Amino acid sequence: MRVWEKNPNMLIPYYLMFSYLYYERDISLIEDTEFDKLCQTLLEKYDSVEHMHKRLVSKESLTAGTGYGIVYTNLIKHSAMKLKETWE
């Protein structure tokens, strides 16, 4: 079970980290189908999810299943690179 399945508030940071790695670093940690599922789940729970970076995530991007065009903070970039180092 993925961490965002246990804690819906983790959908935002994982969406942002996966998007940064994929669109900015050409690194894919999960399959496209799993990313699409993450986007769909986040879209369904969007109104109830709380996270400091929620403002970076639009319902339009989630509907399209993309994180292209996001302006990533240094915290997101750093966290994504740490995730890459530890991902199994």
Feature annotation, model-predicted:
Residues 1-88:
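Phosphate/adenylate-binding "loop-and-lid" substructures adjacent to NTP/NAD/dNTP-binding pockets
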